């Protein structure tokens, strides 16, 4: 199966995940741990792949990431210009 990409990326939120994570002063490992503490399975490797645009982000992961990063899910997917 061939993935459709936007500018060579497989997702639209990866860059904003990285920006929000760095603004929160979290490592990829710390972000993964924060999500895992809420009962969801997302590893440091998965966060890295999301940020690099190497994987698709399922719609159910967007609110998990947004909640852990304290940002609006619509901002993560580029539908709002401000984080909150």
Annotate each predicted stretch with a short phrase:
Residues 12, 23, 39, 54-57, ...:
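Helix-turn-helix/winged-helix DNA-binding modules
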Residues 77-84:
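Charged, helix-prone or intrinsically disordered regulatory segments positioned adjacent to compact structured domains
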Residues 16, 27, 43, 58-61, ...:
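Residues that mark the N-terminal boundary/hinge immediately upstream of a DNA-recognition element
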Residues 45, 52-67, 83:
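Short, basic-rich loop-to-helix N-cap that marks the start of a DNA-contacting helix
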Residues 31, 61-69, 76-77:
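Hydrophobic micro-packing sites on short alpha-helices
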Residues 25-49:
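Short alpha-helical DNA-recognition segment
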Residues 22, 36-37, 52, 81:
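Residue-level detection of the helix-turn-helix DNA-binding "recognition helix"
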Residues 1-24:
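A short, Lys/Arg-rich alpha-helix, primarily the initiator
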């Amino acid at each position: 199966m061939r993935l459709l990409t936007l500018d060579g990326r497989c997702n639209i939120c990866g860059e904003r995940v990285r920006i929000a994570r760095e603004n929160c002063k979290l490592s990829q490992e710390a972000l993964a741990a924060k999500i895992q503490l809420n009962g969801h399975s997302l590893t440091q490797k998965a966060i890295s792949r999301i940020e690099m645009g190497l994987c698709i982000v399922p719609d159910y992961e967007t609110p998990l990431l947004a909640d852990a990063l304290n940002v609006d899910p619509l901002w993560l997917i580029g539908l709002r210009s401000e984080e909150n």
